[in-house]
Regions:
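Metal-cofactor-dependent catalytic cores
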Residues: 1-168
Length: 168
């Protein structure tokens, strides 16, 4: 599975995040990025990755979204959210990340339209079941395994075997 980095984003806290020309990914997250609440971030939530295809699905449902709107650090093109799962490692530009957790959407996202939380997160997602039709729409948290620079246009390549790993 391969894709492309569409946008790298940061903010001083909250949403939306704004596009950068490039960014350094570290174990602590994207250099210069900040979180609004202390329960955001940390080594297992260093990066939030959202697919542009997922954003487009939500836009088709009437939500006013764009790259960075969901608070993601990495917006990708060409990755199938339905086949992504925890434990997968991806080479992203010069960095390596590992998917760790599904993002649980909060009321902050309601600014983009009522019902957005339900449109991207259901009981199956909460249980870690990729059979959910909304699997991955809320985004995947990732830890940074190998720090490095990432820029729009960089390749995103799966580097772990395609077998399923345990869900968290």
């Amino acid at each position: 599975m391969t894709g492309t980095v569409l946008q790298v984003s940061t903010s001083r806290g909250g949403i939306p995040k704004r596009a950068l020309l490039s960014a350094e990914l570290t174990a602590a997250g994207v250099v210069g990025d900040a979180w609004r609440y202390p329960f955001h971030g940390g080594p297992r939530k260093a990066i939030l990755l959202v697919t542009s295809e997922g954003i487009e699905e939500l836009v088709a449902q009437g939500f006013t979204l764009f790259a960075g709107a969901l608070g993601e650090n990495l917006t990708t093109r060409g990755l199938d959210r339905r086949t992504m799962y925890f434990g997968q490692r991806f080479r992203v530009g010069h960095a390596t990340i590992e998917l760790t957790l599904m993002r649980t959407p909060c009321a902050t996202l309601d600014v983009y339209g009522g019902g957005i939380q339900a449109a991207m997160y259901d009981a199956l997602v909460q249980a870690g079941d990729p059979a959910s039709p909304v699997w991955g729409l809320s985004g995947f948290y990732a830890s940074v395994i190998e720090p490095g620079t990432v820029s729009p246009g960089d390749e995103v390549a799966l580097i772990t075997p395609p077998s399923r790993r345990r869900r968290r």
